[in-house]
Amino acid sequence: MDFLIVLKALMMGLVEGFTEFLPISSTGHLIVFGNLIGFHSNHKVFEIAIQLGAVLAVVFEYRQRFSNVLHGVGKDRKANRFVLNLAIAFIPAAVMGLLFGKQIKEHLFNPLSVAVMLVLGGLFILWVEKRQSWAEPKIADVDALRPIDALMIGVAQVFALIPGTSRSGSTIMGGMLWGIERKTATEFSFFLAVPMMVAATAYDVLKHYRFFTLHDVGLILIGFVAAFVSGLVAVKALLRFVSKKNYIPFAYYRIVFGIAIIILWLSGWISWE
């Protein structure tokens, strides 16, 4: 196996893991970074593998919580509420994705759309953070979330179907806008990532499994492990960060990154294939 290809697969896995749970759009980063380093492996199969690695990082980090929920479903009120909330939050984006996913990929999966959504998302984060600085959050614990709160987060997640929006960004900011405390919204976004990404991965596997070859196994394992490790680091670091600070630095980063994408695209450094 060529060392340079291995290095590129490792770097792509790290990018996925580090960006999946930050409100900065992992999709935008993967496309730009993949273009810049010239990574052209079996794209969809590799993408499935690194997404699965990232989501397993959340499962591992919250393994005790998920274990308690699995053992408590049907018997424990908190566990039942937790599962119900995840199901409610899952439905809007799942339904809209099935109905309009193909059209969105055809018409919005381009540099301009991603760049615009990165910039608009950055401005939205600035506004939400300013609003929460004077509006006291009503909910400060995941177990205190009501079904209506989960529904509002689920509705916000629909916007993440547009490339460049960021799934974590839309759910966290949607939760904060609804009156949920920053860290609580972040944790629920992590939990919601599990059913969303598992469902998306399963759907993609059914569509693309025939493109899998034994030749891809090595690169897939490298990307998977890299995404898992970097995802675990990102989850832990983000929780520590939002316990003391806000998301404003990520807002400015999004704006700069969005402008950079347009510059790179116009200059011919990246393509969208």
From Swiss-Prot:
UniProt KW Cell membrane keyword: yes
EC number: 3.6.1.27
Pfam families the UniProt entry points to: BacA
Principal location listed in the UniProt entry: membrane
InterPro entries, sorted: UppP
Alphabetical UniProt keywords: Antibiotic resistance, Cell inner membrane, Cell membrane, Cell shape, Cell wall biogenesis/degradation, Hydrolase, Membrane, Peptidoglycan synthesis, Transmembrane, Transmembrane helix
BP GO annotations: cell wall organization; peptidoglycan biosynthetic process; regulation of cell shape; response to antibiotic
Single GO molecular function: undecaprenyl-diphosphatase activity
Transmembrane feature ranges: 13-35, 45-62, 82-102, 108-128, 144-164, 186-206, 219-239, 250-270
Highest taxon of source: Bacteria
Keyword field contains Zinc: no
Example of a GO cellular component annotation carried by this entry: plasma membrane
UniProt catalytic activity: di-trans,octa-cis-undecaprenyl diphosphate + H2O = di-trans,octa-cis-undecaprenyl phosphate + phosphate + H(+)
Membrane topology summary: Multi-pass membrane protein
Compartments where located: Cell inner membrane
Note: Bacitracin is thought to be involved in the inhibition of peptidoglycan synthesis by sequestering undecaprenyl diphosphate, thereby reducing the pool of lipid carrier available.
HAMAP family (UniProt xref): Undec_diphosphatase
NCBIfam families per UniProt: PRK00281.1-2 (NF001389), PRK00281.1-4 (NF001390), undec_PP_bacA (TIGR00753)
Function: Catalyzes the dephosphorylation of undecaprenyl diphosphate (UPP). Confers resistance to bacitracin.
Family to which the UniProt record says this protein belongs: Belongs to the UppP family.
Protein name in the entry: Undecaprenyl-diphosphatase
Organism: Neisseria meningitidis serogroup C (strain 053442)
Lineage, top ranks: Bacteria, Pseudomonadati, Pseudomonadota, Betaproteobacteria, Neisseriales
Gene giving rise to this polypeptide: uppP
